[in-house]
């Protein structure tokens, strides 16, 4: 797996806690983690025993005519454990010993006999390995505070640490989904626009490769545990600072960005105990033994494939939509206990028939908050009211969908970027309900050589969009409406740049600065670009900025770098990428 940044998300100013809290691992948190992870030890043991029995049966079946063909692909026996066989042999030998475990007279006279040490029973005393992944976490933190630990002689200054972690109301946060050296994590950056300063604040470890991010301010409901009941509605926080993460796993993790160094997310949407592939199940005829797993059965309550896209509803703040490789779109109510039991829980709605292939992207319509827009590898886009999905409309786009966005300036307009490098603009009111009918786009951009993998629409300037592609270019476009140009719509390229991030996988406009965007890609490098440093951009968008009541700040040092700001390591200079076109 190569190093890359797969997704970037902004956090607007004034949202983050000025002084983030430290993660505390106490008994209450351990209980919450165990419940949230749905650790079912007895079920896991039973599944392992069944897997061993099935594997042994497969081995016996192959000892006949084709016994020589029993080969494991990895070069070793993945199913019949040598230790189990040795254990059986040792049991047979132990039958010759006395029932009370005392060695025989012959063994007493044998100087090489080690039966007195009961080495055959040594493994029986080790039980902790079967108690699950969280069984020994508590023992890792013997002292509640490093000040109490006598082995830590260099004490931290709480005031210095508090100052280092402080986030000012004028700071933006950026959350970056990054994989480097086979390790996946979220990196949280602080961006001070007034000083053009970008630095890493903290990071969060992830269990699998991250695919998408979505910021939200709705605190997910805490889970109820045996010793702690679900709190009342008036006892819950009303606002927060959270990031939802979709990965190659079928679950959705929600993390608080106001907690430093957490070990476990605030909430998990899905069923890790049902969808996890940690328990191997042998498949096949018995002639060969391979490490395979059963196909995950589809469910209306949770995803069984990778989560590729997330969208938070800004009007109905407790609603989160997700799109998955399992070909479904699901809706989640964050105000409900995330624990899924036999009586219910999980996703409140699952749209299983909207697409016939992997659903790559999903987004709520901010103007009509019950309407969803989806795009798929079946080369179609669909838009429908979540209350009546059967009455939706759509279009065939001719290539796999990479990204899509509603136009925040037009309730029914949206953009779609495709694998063939095109970007299409549609008016949902003109689309047919039958996909066999023609559905022409309002206009088409030949945006990139290769996939147009990133797309965003500026929330501050009407008609300003940005695209990023496999050709390593980030391009800013100006769309002039018909009423603004004498009855004729026009689309023009304002500026383009290779920001040095490799193939571009994500590019997003700032929620606060009108012409600042962030980009990440195949080089695992985050870059910010203040497009306002470009003369052509200032000229193209100057009138629109003035009409929107926005203004570009006076440029200084950053203008010498073309407005590009990156994370500067010790002894390095900021890489401004290539020059503008």
Which residues does each PLM region occupy?
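Blade-loop segments of beta-propeller domains
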Residues: 200-243, 248-249, 266-297, 305
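Beta-strand-rich domains and repeat architectures in extracellular enzymes and scaffolds
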Residues: 141-187, 205-220, 230-231, 240-243
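Short glycine/acidic-enriched loop and turn motifs that connect beta-strands
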Residues: 181, 250-251, 260
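Acidic/hydrophobic-patterned starts of short beta strands in beta-sheet-rich repeat architectures
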Residues: 173-174, 227-230, 234-244, 319-321, ...
């Amino acid at each position: 797996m190569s190093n890359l940044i797969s997704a970037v998300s902004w956090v607007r100013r004034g949202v983050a806690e000025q002084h983030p809290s430290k993660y505390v691992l106490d008994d209450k948190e351990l209980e919450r983690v165990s419940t949230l992870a749905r650790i079912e030890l007895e079920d896991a043991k039973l599944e392992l025993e069944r897997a061993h029995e099935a594997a042994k049966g497969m081995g016996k079946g192959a000892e006949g005519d084709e016994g020589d063909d029993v080969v494991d692909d990895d070069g070793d026996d993945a199913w019949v454990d040598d230790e189990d066989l040795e254990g059986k042999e040792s049991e047979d030998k132990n039958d010759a010993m006395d029932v009370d475990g005392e060695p025989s007279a012959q063994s007493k006279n044998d100087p090489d006999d080690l039966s007195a040490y009961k080495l055959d029973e040594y493994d029986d005393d080790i039980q902790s390995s079967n108690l699950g992944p969280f069984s020994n976490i508590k023992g890792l933190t013997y002292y509640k505070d490093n000040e109490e630990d006598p082995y830590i002689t260099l004490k931290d200054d709480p005031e210095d640490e508090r100052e280092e972690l402080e986030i000012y109301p004028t700071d933006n946060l950026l959350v970056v989904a990054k994989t480097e050296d086979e390790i996946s994590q979220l990196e949280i950056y602080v961006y001070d626009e007034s000083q053009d300063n970008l630095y890493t604040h903290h990071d969060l470890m992830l269990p699998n490769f991250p695919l998408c991010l979505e910021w939200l301010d709705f605190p997910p409901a805490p889970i109820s545990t045996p010793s702690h009941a679900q709190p009342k509605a008036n006892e819950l926080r009303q606002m927060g600072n959270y990031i939802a993460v979709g990965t190659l796993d079928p679950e959705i993790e929600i993390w608080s960005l106001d907690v430093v160094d957490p070990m476990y997310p605030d909430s998990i949407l899905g069923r890790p105990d049902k969808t996890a592939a940690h328990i191997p199940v042998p498949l096949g005829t018995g002639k060969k033994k391979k490490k395979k797993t059963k196909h995950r059965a589809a469910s209306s309550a949770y995803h069984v494939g990778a989560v590729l896209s997330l969208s938070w509803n800004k009007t109905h703040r407790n609603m989160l939509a997700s799109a998955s490789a399992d070909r479904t779109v699901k809706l989640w109510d964050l105000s409900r206990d995330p624990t899924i039991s036999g009586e219910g829980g999980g996703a409140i709605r699952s749209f299983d028939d909207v697409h016939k292939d992997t659903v790559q992207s999903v987004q709520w319509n901010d103007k009509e908050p019950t309407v969803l827009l989806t795009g798929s590898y079946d080369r179609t886009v669909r838009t429908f009211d979540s209350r009546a999905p059967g009455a939706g409309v759509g279009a065939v786009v001719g290539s796999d969908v990479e990204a899509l966005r509603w136009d925040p300036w037009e309730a029914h307009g949206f953009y779609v970027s495709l694998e063939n490098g095109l970007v299409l603009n549609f008016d949902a009111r003109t689309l047919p309900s039958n996909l066999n009918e023609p559905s022409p786009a309002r206009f088409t951009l030949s945006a990139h050589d290769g996939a147009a993998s990133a797309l965003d629409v500026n929330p501050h300037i009407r008609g300003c969009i940005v695209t990023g592609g496999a050709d390593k270019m980030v391009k800013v476009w100006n769309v002039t409406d018909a009423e603004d140009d004498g009855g004729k719509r026009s689309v023009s390229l304002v500026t383009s740049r290779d920001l040095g991030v490799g193939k571009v996988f994500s590019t997003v406009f700032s929620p606060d600065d009108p012409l600042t965007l962030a980009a990440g890609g195949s080089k695992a490098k985050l870059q910010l670009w203040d497009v306002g440093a470009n003369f052509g951009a200032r000229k193209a968008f100057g009138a629109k900025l003035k009409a929107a009541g926005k203004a570009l700040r006076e440029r200084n040092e950053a203008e010498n770098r073309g407005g590009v700001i990156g994370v500067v390591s010790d002894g390095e200079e900021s890489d401004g990428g290539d020059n503008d076109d």
